[in-house]
Amino acid sequence: KVPQGELEISLDDVHFAYEKDREILKGITMNFPANSFISFVGESGCGKSTLAGILTARNRGYTGSVKIGGVDISDIMENELMSHMTKITHNSYLFAGTVKENLRMAKPDASKEEMEEVLEKVNLLAFLKEQDGLQTVLSERGENFSGGQRQRLALARALLFDTPIYIFDEATSNIDMESEEMIMNVIRELSKTKMILFISHRLSNVVDSDCIYMMKDGIVAEEGTHEHLMRKKGAYQHLFDKQK
């Protein structure tokens, strides 16, 4: 089982390959303290999402050790592991039904107040009150909502899960700037009490991280705070300036 209380994560010399002769992660060692905002950046294909797959028990065939709260994740049942972490991607699934039904997937006994509180945090409550409130109906995959609204609703649902660890895998890609800014504000606030593991190709979103891992070809090329990495004038600084 995963221990109770604040959890830290440690990876030691983690290697992973989808195919025998093509290693994706080449000896990754990282430590994530509890209640920290950790970001992973780098060109696509550098191993960021593969790493998220290992942490969520999707990618099992790795070598090396991955521990949560000092317990190796290979000794933890997947459903037990996932009760301690919530993963939000850029296309989080919403199903046809009411907003209330979608939110209660995360917490079946959530009260009206709890649901309205998380909707307020993601700035959707006023919009929904102009519709049918919690009874507002979503079409299949939420297609009657904008991309930014769908993502904010997925985030509201994630907040109801209330797990110690949150993994955001490109959760702010392909949405409007206003929604992106709102989501980043929620994530920054969340990082005060939760561990945030944040994967992003947009470096402006990772500036406030406690630690940034710049990955390249399956290894950690650079690590540190934004200020530290900018002073290094290496790959991170080059990519950051290129994106300005």
Per-region residue spans from a language model:
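ABC-type nucleotide-binding domain
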Residues: 2-244
